[in-house]
């Protein structure tokens, strides 16, 4: 009986989980500015084929309780950072690659606020 109740609770919670969203085009809700910029590697020669850091900037107006998660690939993706401010900037470690989606999600509601793919790394001319 106890196992049945636990199983029912797990199924009920799973049913309440929001559907996974995998972005296919850049987006941002009204009043949200969200940008992703590719940065050259700090050490060694600039090589677009190798992972590189990315700079993420955001500015959200009129957000009651700014608590945001930065996820990779989808709304169920890997959590890479958290922030509790309506405006800010973060620079990632060198794991970014062209086309990797970075999602900006409200931590309280799981609402997708913005999404942008990492752009191609353009190396400075020698």
Residue ranges and their predicted role:
Residues 60-67, 97:
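Short proline/glycine-enriched turn/loop motifs at strand-loop junctions of beta-rich domains
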Residues 79-86:
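Short beta-strand segments within Ig-like beta-sandwich modules, predominantly Fibronectin type-III
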Residues 12-15:
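C-terminal motif of bacterial Sec signal peptides marking the signal peptidase cleavage site
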Residues 24-25, 110-126:
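Edge beta-strands of extracellular beta-sandwich domains
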Residues 17-19:
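Bacterial signal peptide processing site
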Residues 1-8:
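Sec-dependent signal peptide recognition
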Residues 50-56:
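Structural beta-strand segments of beta-rich domains
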């Amino acid at each position: 009986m106890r196992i049945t109740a636990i199983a029912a609770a797990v199924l009920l919670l799973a049913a309440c989980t929001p559907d996974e969203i995998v972005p296919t085009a850049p987006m941002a809700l009204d009043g949200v500015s969200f940008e992703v910029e590719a940065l050259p590697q700090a050490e060694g020669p600039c090589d677009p084929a190798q992972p590189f850091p990315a700079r993420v900037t955001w500015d959200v107006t009129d957000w009651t309780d700014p608590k945001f998660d930065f996820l990779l690939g989808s709304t169920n993706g890997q959590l890479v950072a958290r922030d509790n401010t309506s405006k800010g900037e973060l620079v990632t470690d060198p794991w970014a690659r062209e086309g990797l989606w970075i999602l900006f999600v409200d931590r309280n509601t799981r609402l997708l606020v913005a999404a942008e793919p990492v752009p191609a790394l353009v190396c400075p001319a020698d």
